[in-house]
Amino acid sequence: MYVLGFLYIHKIYMRLILSCFLLFTILSFGQLNKPISLEFNYLKGNILPHKKGLDHLITGHPEGVMLSVLKQSDGSKEWQKDYNYPEYGAYFLYQDFKNDILGQNYAAGFQSNFYFLKRNIQFKVASGIAMTTHPYDKETNSKNNAFGSKFMANINIGLAYKTYFFNKKIAAQTGFFFSHYSNGRTKSPNSGINTINLNIGLAYNLSTSKINKKDSVVTSIENSKEPIHYNVVVRSGLNESSVVNSGQHSFYHIGFFANKKLNKKTTLQLGTELFLSNFYKDFIKYQSIAYPNKQIDANTDYKRVGVFIGYELFFDKVAVEAQAGYYVYQPFKFDIPIYDRIGIKYYFNKK
């Protein structure tokens, strides 16, 4: 029985271990003069029922492991000191949803760890590409309304308490871990899956370099004297309505916004945008025919106009952007009038 258990674990995690070893080799080769650590976390939790129609997918407690290879910033850039010497690197995540319809997910991407309170509180952000073993299939897996495609985006956020041993060579940590999987409506169905987990983990410092430690996490940030900037943005891509196999259509989102940089870390935004999502044209016609009791006019305008506020957090030339908006013009009221957007931007010019 013990042999069978070992073979089962070996089969599931072999690809994970080999992939992480490759990531470790790429990141750490020739760089052991700087603090490099290998981090392991075990996860177990629950699927969040964030939408209706997911009850049949919640049959157990998902569990998984996350392996990361991380390098601590050395303070060579000013922003690294401002953020208390964060870690950055790569991660590999495996999650078993304990459900025959969902199967398992593998994900890999980039990770950053930020520290507070003498590096005892860790805030983790990781984002990458995920692959599911059980995507939607009309013939073999028609009940999977969460993953309409084999590949999708993966976003992870964690908060943990970390304590150090043996001259900071080894650390133990425990906390909460949130994971999100979605293909961004590029292919239906796409309810996506969110899990909230408890995690326990270990980290091992592979180098002999000391860990940079800031005396205080509170820094004085000088207010920016930059003027208000005005911007035009055009976004485009492909997406699909919630009707399975209805086909992908192009979309064009045209926005105008003003932004004011408050300091070297933060910027506020205020703007408006026009949404031209072409899949809505066919979707409105479909709804008018399929649900005559709703009395939907097939010629209803598919366009939408929104107003939004936004926030940018800068890490040198990279900025994390978050926006929340409200549709002030939405003739076809299928979605709720509130929307949000999260993204990453890179500035080629100096800010």
Write out the residue ranges for each language-model feature:
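Predominantly the C-terminal beta-signal and adjacent terminal strand-loop region
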Residues: A160-S207, T219-K225, D335, Y339-K351
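Outer-membrane beta-barrel strand-turn architecture
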Residues: L32, S73-G75, F116-K118, T163-N167, ...
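Residues that define the transmembrane beta-barrel architecture of outer-membrane proteins
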Residues: K34, T59-V65, N84, L102-A108, ...
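Outer-membrane beta-barrel translocator/channel fold
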Residues: I36-D55, Q72, S76-D82, L117, ...
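Outer-envelope beta-barrel architecture signal
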Residues: L32-L38, D82-Y88, R119-F123, K168-A172, ...
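Residues on the lipid-exposed face of transmembrane beta-strands in outer-membrane beta-barrel proteins
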Residues: F40, L67-K71, A108-F114, V125-I129, ...
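Short glycine/proline- and aromatic-enriched beta-strand/turn motifs that initiate or cap beta-hairpins
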Residues: Q31-K77, K213-N259
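Transmembrane beta-strands of outer-membrane beta-barrel pores
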Residues: Y42-L48, K71-S73, F92-K98, S127-T133, ...
